[in-house]
Every structure is written in C-alpha cells, then in structure tokens.
Amino acid sequence: MSNTQAERSIIGMIDMFHKYTRRDDKIEKPSLLTMMKENFPNFLSACDKKGTNYLADVFEKKDKNEDKKIDFSEFLSLLGDIATDYHKQSHGAAPCSGGSQ
C-alpha cells in the first residue's frame, strides 16, 4: 500500500529535519537559518523579515530547553507557526498577521 498524501507530508518534514541535523539529531543555529532560507523564502519574504535578526529571534523562541539546538519537537513547533500563518492567509488574513511568530 502506498502512503497517503498526509503520510508523505509528514515523511517529507522528517526528511527535511534530518537534512539539517547533526549526529545528535538536532539542528544548530546556522543550519536552522539555512533551512529557513532554503525552504521558506516566500514565507520570509512575505513577512518582510528576511534579516538574520528575525531568524535569530525565531531560534531563541523555539529553543525551549536553551541547549542552543533545535530538537524535533521544537522544529515541529516552528513548522506549526508557519503552517498557522498560511492557514490564516487561506481565510483572508495578511501574511504574518499574528500568532507565535
């Protein structure tokens, strides 16, 4: 049986996470910045927050245990914020109109 679209989406998120992790299965700050720029350029552009300071703030907000790395659950929290923004846009909200960002 082949995977459903939802299953493929989740597998894709896991693959994206692993592309930027190290042996400890966590993303360090430089890799997170690269991941955001490579995978979410339209999101960053729409928010008009392309600068490193914005991305650094996102890292600090998502690094809940303050280990200077992003684990998988922290990564999912970041993706959730991005998905929430796109969902709001689907209902007519302007990009980056609020939320955890």
Curated annotation (Swiss-Prot):
Key word Zinc present: yes
Modified residues (N-acetylserine): 2
PROSITE patterns hit by this protein: EF_HAND_1, EF_HAND_2, S100_CABP
Pfam families with a match to the protein in the record: S_100
Taxonomy, superkingdom: Eukaryota
Cellular component terms (Gene Ontology): azurophil granule lumen; collagen-containing extracellular matrix; cytoplasm; cytosol; endoplasmic reticulum; extracellular region; extracellular space; focal adhesion
Any one GO biological process: positive regulation of T cell chemotaxis
Residues reported to bind Ca(2+): 63, 65, 67, 69, 74
Domain EF-hand: 13-48, 50-85
Disulfide bonds: 47-96
Keywords: Acetylation, Calcium, Cytoplasm, Disulfide bond, Metal-binding, Repeat, Secreted, Zinc
UniProt binding sites for Zn(2+): 18, 25, 87, 91
Compartments reported by the entry: Cytoplasm; Secreted
Record keyword Ribonucleoprotein present: no
GO MF annotation list: calcium ion binding; calcium-dependent protein binding; RAGE receptor binding; zinc ion binding; zinc ion sequestering activity
Tissue: Fetal ear, skin, and tongue and human cell lines. Highly up-regulated in psoriatic epidermis. Also highly expressed in the urine of bladder squamous cell carcinoma (SCC) bearing patients.
Family of this protein: Belongs to the S-100 family.
Subunit structure: Interacts with RANBP9.
Protein name per UniProt: Protein S100-A7
Source organism of the structure: Homo sapiens (Human)
Gene designation: S100A7
